[in-house]
Every structure is written in structure tokens, then in C-alpha cells.
Regions:
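Iron-sulfur-associated redox domains of electron-transfer enzymes in respiratory
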Residues: 1-158
Length: 161
């Protein structure tokens, strides 16, 4: 099971300030606790600013075939946006980021693990569910799982550092 928690409002608004935003919500896995009410409230606030080009709510965005079909329907609105803001677990953000390579894709949620079922993605994605949400800084690549030492603060220091 996973728990997704919204990032701090200040962190999200700093990402979206002055940008046109397309929002993607994932309501897929029943095993994922998703803060629907809080996300809806925040999205209404963002939309009130007039910078939201569209909102897509779907399920299982971690399934690439499903995601591709859904995104194609909204591609004109996505192209208008400077930023795609994804309200899902880290794997969902990675799936969207992989498909929309020419767009800035940011996570609006942090992901935390709870023992048990971990979602339905048929592929190997790398998210350690650390709750830090580094995906916004790294183009959808989790540095915790991509680095054998889980370093996030620079190059590998080798055996001495």
C-alpha cells in the first residue's frame, strides 16, 4: 500500500508561478491513499488564477498504454501548458515524464510506503517511496534508486568519502 501526501502549497505554487499548467490526477489503485479533497481544493485555487489549461482525471497512469491513450485526447491542452503537474505516486509521475519528454513534468505529491500491495504497474519503475519527491528536480528520475549509494548531493565520493 502507498500513501500520497500533497507537497506543501508553497512548494507547488513556486513551481507553477507564472506558468500555464496542465493537471493530471490519478485515482487508480484502491491501495493508494490519495488526498482527493485537498488536491481538488488546491486545483481550484490554481484554476482561479487562470493559468490551468486543463485537468485530466483518470486511473492507473502507471500503465503506459492506458496513459498514452488518455494523453492523446488532451494533447492540444498539454501543448499549451509550460508545466504538467501530476497528482499521483512517484511511479505515475515517472510514466507521464517518460511519455512527455519535451514537457516539464512535476509531482504534486510525495509518496510514502506502507507494507503490502504496491500498485498495478506492469513495468519496473524506480521509486523508493522516500517521501522527498526528488522527481521535480531530476526530470522524473529518482536519484535514491538510480544511484547505488542513494546520493542526492553531487557526484559519487568514492570509497573515501
Amino acid at each position: 500500500m502507498l500513501i500520497t501526501q500533497l507537497k506543501a502549497k508553497e512548494a507547488i505554487t513556486s513551481l507553477t508561478a507564472g506558468k500555464k499548467v496542465f493537471i493530471i490526477n490519478c485515482h487508480g489503485c484502491k491501495e493508494v491513499r490519495f488526498p482527493e479533497k485537498e488536491a481538488a481544493r488546491l486545483q481550484k485555487e490554481l484554476a482561479a488564477e487562470g493559468n490551468v489549461t486543463g485537468i485530466m482525471t483518470t486511473d492507473y497512469i502507471c500503465n503506459p498504454e492506458n496513459m498514452e491513450l488518455r494523453l492523446k485526447k488532451h494533447m492540444s491542452k498539454i501543448q499549451e501548458a509550460d508545466l504538467v503537474l501530476v497528482f499521483s505516486c512517484g511511479v505515475g509521475v515517472q510514466t507521464v515524464s517518460e511519455y512527455l519528454e519535451d514537457k516539464m513534468v512535476c509531482a504534486a505529491c510525495d509518496t510514502y510506503p506502507v507494507p503490502g500491495f504496491q500498485g498495478v504497474t506492469p513495468l519496473e519503475y524506480k521509486c523508493d517511496q522516500c517521501g522527498e519527491g526528488y522527481l521535480n528536480l531530476t526530470g522524473g528520475i529518482c536519484p535514491i534508486t538510480a544511484c547505488s549509494k542513494s546520493l542526492v548531493n553531487g557526484q559519487c565520493g568514492g570509497s573515501k568519502n
